[in-house]
Amino acid sequence: MTQALQALIDQAWEDRTSLSPKSAPNDIREAVANVISQLDSGALRVAEKQGKDWVVNQWIKKAVLLSFRLEDNAPMSAGGFAQFYDKVPTKFANWTGDDFAKAGFRVVPPAVARRGSYIARNAVLMPSYVNIGAYVDEGTMVDTWATVGSCAQIGKNVHLSGGVGIGGVLEPLQANPVIIEDNCFIGARSEVVEGVIIEENSVISMGVYLGQSTKIYDRETGEIHYGRVPAGSVVVAGNLPSKDGKYSLYCAVIVKKVDAQTRAKTSLNDLLRD
């Protein structure tokens, strides 16, 4: 079933310039809708960890992008207090109290999640935004004004602090999604974009900006990483001097490995997830 679905999506992607809301064949519409529905339920995800490596299901990302070609904009209501005009319905538009109870997570107004995003049990969405294709795993808090970009993968027991920006893949078009592994803490107003991977048990201080070209300097070893924060790292914003010493450029600095003191400062509050 999945292989046939993938083949149909891959072919539709090759023919994408000819597709429109009026011209798209029913089989393509149904295939894309199937993928979005499975993303919404967590049955499919854009990236999965296999062993030590993350594998990106590019065909699923293609389906997300194709969905924008298959729908017209339409008015949408948000509980009667606002009107919107978009192609993607909100995830909770038709949910009842029973639906929320069964899903087992909290949504604080006016948090918004788009259809095609997945929110796992015991997660908390403060007034925040979760885009299509994103995966938010169990026990994670998306704090106030944080944004989880399209197709981003957020692990278990992660804390995304206030104003954190997790980049998406749709615009500008990115090959791989941002991945925040289990038990990470991302400090206020930090930005993680361009498919950067934050490995498990890491702590990113407030105001740290990480993209593929950002130097991630380990002060203990002198090693420089790109696009990946090693597991268990504590990272702060810093600068590195140029070779000629005339100027310095922004970098992120791994100052130490996570210890008991760090964990005490960044521990999650189970009372907020009951």
UniProtKB/Swiss-Prot annotation:
Its EC number is 2.3.1.117. It comes from the Bacteria. Substrate binds at R106, D143. Pathway: Amino-acid biosynthesis; L-lysine biosynthesis via DAP pathway; LL-2,6-diaminopimelate from (S)-tetrahydrodipicolinate (succinylase route): step 1/3. GO terms for cellular component: cytoplasm. It catalyses: (S)-2,3,4,5-tetrahydrodipicolinate + succinyl-CoA + H2O = (S)-2-succinylamino-6-oxoheptanedioate + CoA. Keywords: Acyltransferase, Amino-acid biosynthesis, Cytoplasm, Diaminopimelate biosynthesis, Lysine biosynthesis, Repeat, Transferase. It is found in: Cytoplasm. One of its GO terms (biological process) is diaminopimelate biosynthetic process. Its main location: cytoplasm. InterPro entries: DapD_Trfase_Hexpep_rpt_fam, Hexapep, Hexapep_transf_CS, THP_succinylTrfase_dom1, THP_succinylTrfase_N_sf, Trimer_LpxA-like_sf. It holds the Pfam family THDPS_N_2. PROSITE patterns: HEXAPEP_TRANSFERASES. SUPFAM superfamilies: Trimeric LpxA-like enzymes. CDD domains: LbH_THP_succinylT (cd03350). It is an enzyme of class 2 (transferase). The keyword Repeat applies. One of its GO terms (molecular function) is nucleotidyltransferase activity. PANTHER family: 2,3,4,5-TETRAHYDROPYRIDINE-2,6-DICARBOXYLATE N-SUCCINYLTRANSFERASE, MOLYBDENUM COFACTOR GUANYLYLTRANSFERASE. Belongs to the transferase hexapeptide repeat family. HAMAP family: DapD (MF_00811). Homotrimer. This is 2,3,4,5-tetrahydropyridine-2,6-dicarboxylate N-succinyltransferase. It comes from Cupriavidus metallidurans (strain ATCC 43123 / DSM 2839 / NBRC 102507 / CH34) (Ralstonia metallidurans). The gene is dapD.
